[in-house]
Amino acid sequence: MSKKVLFIVGSLRQGSFNHQMALEAEKALAGKVEVSYLDYSALPLFSQDLEVPTHPAVAAAREAVLVADAIWIFSPVYNFSIPGTVKNLLDWLSRALDLSDTRGVSALQDKFVTVSSVANAGHDQLFAIYKDLLPFIRTQGVGDFTAARVNDSAWADRKLVLEETVLNSLEKQAQDLVEAIQ
């Protein structure tokens, strides 16, 4: 059975720079693991009032995470922090699957997670937040995170061009993630 890596792209915009980075990371994983992308665009804002019955979008996100061996988050920087959409997703996924045991296993429990980001500033702050958050929600951070800036021409033509050093970093990140789940 093939190992599975779930990609979470933090920008819901079609063709976002972080989605373009994810496509490059997918190339680095080609032939090594099965990659899928999580569509969490229908996820409601977290509220305990919505936990029972389980919202279909929450159930689908949990199922996708449960069958994955690892998660790779591609996160823009919004005001030097995690995008609200990603934080909301992690809030849902970190909740105990059995609500009668609030410290019980979650969909994210012990998952291997790595993070990459395309943004023009704030990578250090963003990565520090993820490095604090990931162990708190009982995941295992893997390897060094990859940061990239948006090339100037991308603002006009919407085409991200990653520098060779970034592509090499994504290759190393992919290798570290594959090794973690073997």
PLM region spans:
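N-terminal beta1-alpha1 ligand-phosphate binding loop
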Residues: 2-32
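Glycine-rich phosphate/pyrophosphate-binding loop and the adjoining helix
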Residues: 6, 140-182
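Short beta-strand elements in bilobed, periplasmic/extracellular small-molecule ligand-binding domains
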Residues: 33-41, 45, 140-149
